[in-house]
From Swiss-Prot:
GO molecular function annotation: dCTP deaminase (dUMP-forming) activity; dCTP deaminase activity; nucleotide binding
Name listed for the protein in its UniProt record: dCTP deaminase, dUMP-forming
Keyword annotations of the record: Hydrolase, Nucleotide metabolism, Nucleotide-binding
Site (Important for bifunctional activity): G114, W115
Reaction equations catalysed: dCTP + 2 H2O = dUMP + NH4(+) + diphosphate
Pfam families in UniProt: DCD
GO biological process, one term: dUMP biosynthetic process
EC code: 3.5.4.30
Gene: dcd
Length: 185
């Protein structure tokens, strides 16, 4: 079941869902708006192949900055953080969706990483890309996406109980940590 406005408000006010900072004006009929943070990371152009299993290729060749705005150029891919940190209980999951007004500027908010497991805590890393033909300036603090909450049965092993929870309590845009996975044949 998707939570509606009064259910989202109730669960936040009772501390069942954590949103920090919380602004009740961001509650929508079926979601809560989330805002762009001010930490950004991106890969510099180059020919070195990124191998998800090799840490140095994943973490090398990057730049990062903290700024009040960033210009996304056509085709540019940037990791960004949400201003809000969230905390989910073991029976609520969330998905992140881009706001249509941002999408109409050609900005994709996430590539495929839009699912947030029960038990997750931290800021959300956004996988932003500009598919417009023109550069677009994005400002820290602007509403950029929406979190939709779904109730589920209680997870036996929520994200915060997993030994390999790579992104638990992240508080800035975080590069892939796929290299921490065991390689499977």
């Amino acid at each position: 079941m998707i939570l509606v406005d009064w259910q989202i408000t109730d669960r936040i006010e009772r501390g069942y869902i954590g949103i920090d900072p919380y602004n009740p004006e961001l509650i929508q009929p079926n979601s809560i708006d989330i805002r762009l943070g001010n930490h950004f990371v991106w890969y510099t152009p180059g020919d070195e192949i990124i191998d998800p299993y090799i840490r140095d290729t994943v973490t090398g060749g990057t730049e990062e900055m903290t700024a009040e705005s960033i210009v996304l150029h056509p085709g540019q891919f940037v990791l960004a953080e949400t201003m809000e940190a969230i905390r989910l209980p073991d029976n609520i999951v969330a998905s992140i969706e881009g706001k249509s007004s941002i999408a109409r500027l050609g900005i994709e908010l996430h590539q495929t990483g839009g699912w947030i497991d029960a038990g997750f805590a931290g800021s959300i890393t956004l996988e932003m890309c500009n598919v417009n033909q023109r550069p677009v300036r994005m400002h820290a603090g602007m509403p950029i996406g929406q979190l939709v909450f779904y109730t589920t049965e209680r997870a036996l092993c929520p994200y915060n109980a997993k030994k390999d929870a790579k992104y638990l309590n992240q508080r800035q845009a975080t590069l892939s940590r796929y290299y921490e996975n065991k390689k499977r044949a």
